[in-house]
Amino acid sequence: MTAADLRSILATSLSGLLGTYTDTDGSTYPAIYVGNPPSSWTATGLECRIGIVPDMDQTPAYVTGAITETHRVRLVSHGAPTNTLTALRKVLSRWPTAQAREIPPNEGLGILAQHTITIPT
């Protein structure tokens, strides 16, 4: 599964929960992006960012190792986090072996409330 494939699946699964990106000319887009969105865009509501390149891990095995790939997804809450938990539940029900981690907000550091999800390919 590529990052583009994952984006397509998540866009469908999270339809109605995603916030919006607004660019400099006022155009709006669903707040889901592979990589980092342009710095000139602003996000409102729930934002979903998908890593461009999957992480790889090698599990030692007899003679050869098994390589597993995972995609890292970040759900960022711009405002009330109500959609975040609903979105997290949808993603985890779609990929039962995925792992989620909460990153608590920190106003002093400018960190918004968010969850990172590691999804196996």
What residue spans do the PLM features occupy?
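Exposed beta-strand and adjacent loop surfaces of beta-rich binding modules
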Residues: 11, 70-72, 85
